[in-house]
């Protein structure tokens, strides 16, 4: 594939099935993909899929060579999770470049988003929002299990989601495995889209040092304190060794995205320092990781920047 997913002559057209929980950000994703040059079709009846794919863009048309993103979910007429999975596998067997992108979000956050926007859940017209969320999660389970890529938007704002999509599907996205190193706070829950997760709570904690507590793991003094733990050098070496062993295997197996999550109690000191240190080592080894500190800077106000990537979509 060339930049932004544009297809070279003779290559199969890339097809991305965009699906997931209502309110998790699918509509935001489709809009972002369209802005990046993708052709997008939302809420396509599954029965019309073959007809759409058979109608290849005419030579010289605006859609020629553009990758295709299809929004399919529980709102779709004749929707069937297992049926969609079968169709995707059939496309692959026929030589098509087809994959599934699934957007997820915690039930609590989905409920909050619907409450905040006062939107109705598509599967809870005459029931509680929580009932609709639970029912939809059950319906979508086969798609989630078969997904090639999972994006959890529980802690993501609209802007953060758009930035993530630009990194993964935009002009700067290349071939190979896209690598993300994320720090997080166990107190705020583990990231559900992590492929590898490491717990830094065995290291001594700068939180209990008054002059270090106000600063983050980005501070050199905080980093020096953490690195001064007697177990730190060996633990770091072993963790890096394991990751460097596994990453080439992930790429060999065709995994497009790998997220390494580094956690500590508050997501401010140990996990932040170790994530930065790990990313630096990975760059030395020829990788190009993106670093994200999930809980280091929380949104000041939902009113300043929406944390609802796509309620009702």
Curated annotation (Swiss-Prot):
- InterPro entries found in the cross-reference section: P-loop_NTPase, RapZ-like, RapZ-like_N, RapZ_C
Compositionally biased residues, Basic and acidic residues: 292-303
List where the protein spans the membrane: none
Record carries keyword Protease = no
Extract the coiled-coil ranges from the record: none
Q: Which SUPFAM superfamilies match?
A: P-loop containing nucleoside triphosphate hydrolases
Task: Please name the Pfam families in this protein's record.
Answer: PapZ_C, RapZ-like_N
- Family that this chain belongs to: Belongs to the RapZ-like family.
**Protein's organism:** Rhizorhabdus wittichii (strain DSM 6014 / CCUG 31198 / JCM 15750 / NBRC 105917 / EY 4224 / RW1) (Sphingomonas wittichii)
GO MF, one example:
ATP binding
List the keywords (alphabetical): ATP-binding, GTP-binding, Nucleotide-binding
Q: Which PANTHER family does the entry link to?
A: RNASE ADAPTER PROTEIN RAPZ
- Residue positions annotated to bind ATP are 20-27
Q: What is this protein called?
A: Nucleotide-binding protein Swit_0399
């Amino acid at each position: 594939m060339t930049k932004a997913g544009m297809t070279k002559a003779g290559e199969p057209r890339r097809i991305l099935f965009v699906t997931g929980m209502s309110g998790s950000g699918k509509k935001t994703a489709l809009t972002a993909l369209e802005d990046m040059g993708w052709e997008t079709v939302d809420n396509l009846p599954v029965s019309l899929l073959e007809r759409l794919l058979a109608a290849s863009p005419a030579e010289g048309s605006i859609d020629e060579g553009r990758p295709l993103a299809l929004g399919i979910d529980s709102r779709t007429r004749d929707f069937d999770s297992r049926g969609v999975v079968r169709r995707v596998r059939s496309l692959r067997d026929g030589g098509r470049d087809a994959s599934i992108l699934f957007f997820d979000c915690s039930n609590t956050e989905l409920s909050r988003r619907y409450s905040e926007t006062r939107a109705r859940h598509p599967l809870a017209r005459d029931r509680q929002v929580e009932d609709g969320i639970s029912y939809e999660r059950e319906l979508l389970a086969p798609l989630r299990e078969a997904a090639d890529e999972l994006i959890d938007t529980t802690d993501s704002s609209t802007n953060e989601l758009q930035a993530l999509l630009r990194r993964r599907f935009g002009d700067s996205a290349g071939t190979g495995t896209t690598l993300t190193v994320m720090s997080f706070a166990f107190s705020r829950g583990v990231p559900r889209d992590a492929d590898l997760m490491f717990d830094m709570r065995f290291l001594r904690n700068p939180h209990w040092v008054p002059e270090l507590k106000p600063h983050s793991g980005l501070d050199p003094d905080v980093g020096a304190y953490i690195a001064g733990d007697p177990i730190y050098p060996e633990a770091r070496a072993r963790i890096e060794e394991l990751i460097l062993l596994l990453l080439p295997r992930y790429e060999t197996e065709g995994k497009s995205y790998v997220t390494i999550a580094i956690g500590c109690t508050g997501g401010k000191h140990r996990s932040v320092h170790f994530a930065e240190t790990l990313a630096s080592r990975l760059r030395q080894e020829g990788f190009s990781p993106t670093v994200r500190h999930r809980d280091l800077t929380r949104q000041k106000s939902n009113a300043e920047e929406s944390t609802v990537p796509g309620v009702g979509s």
